[in-house]
Amino acid sequence: MILIAGAVYGGVLVLLYWKQESLLFFPTRLPHDHRFSVSDVVERPVDVDGARLSALHFRQPNAKGLVFFLHGNGGSLEEWVTGTEFYRRTGFDLFIIDYRGYGKSTGRIESEAQMHADVRAAWLSIAPEYAGRKIVLYGRSLGTGLATRLATDVEAHLLVLISPYSSLRDVARDHYPWVPSALLRYPLRTDEWLPRVKMPVLILHGERDSVIGIAHAERLHMLVPSTEFVRLQGVDHNDVHLSTEYLDKLAERIGNL
């Protein structure tokens, strides 16, 4: 019986190792001719190695700068861009991408290194147009690790992390303690990158987050005490954008750049 149980356990681990993309990423696919419901954005795809990323750009006259937005692990740009009122309020443009296999983006996610390379390519496609103006790197959930890694290599004026993780390995350990963390091919070590970030950092995290516990944000804040850390009372993981405290704090911080 012990041998059988061991064989089953080993088989499950092998399956998890090779199929973990299906456990980490939950894209919504869109047809290539899909028309986005938000009318005041333009499509601006980004060519990357072996694929093309769907991206949306909201631009307004005399913008103060740009919010470079990296979203979470589910949905598509159709769900992530529901309006531009916040950006009009703060005077900032928006540039947001769908990862490979999300929305209208082609290809599929194959490695963490590939994701970082894609994010950097997207950055290089837009950032030069905002030279001399303020740029905000914004990461939400999955996007927080990607944004933090990018922030170690580029010049911007603020890094915003919404519902961040110390690492995806730590998140996996929270939910699947029986799985050896070394098997995760997407460790996304925010805890290693954040101390290397030179720009100001704002962290907002829901106190009731049931997906990425607030302990992750607390750990990051302890690593870099100079970060501004805001606990969102009564807020879970998927309702952050509905929090008045979140919207007001973000608008204040970005608007004062």
Per-region residue spans from a language model:
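Active-site nucleophile loop of the alpha/beta-hydrolase fold
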Residues: A156, V160-D170, Y186, T190, ...
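Membrane-embedded segments
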Residues: R52-S125, R133
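An N-terminal hydrophobic leader/cap segment in hydrolases
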Residues: A5-D47
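Short beta-strand/loop motif that positions the catalytic acidic residue
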Residues: V197-K198, I203-H205, D209
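Catalytic histidine-centered segment of alpha/beta-hydrolase-like enzymes
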Residues: V235-E245
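Conserved alpha/beta-hydrolase "acid-adjacent" motif
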Residues: S210-H216
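Alpha/beta-hydrolase fold nucleophile elbow
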Residues: Y130-S141
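Catalytic active-site module of serine/aspartate enzymes centered on a nucleophile-bearing elbow/loop
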Residues: S243-L257
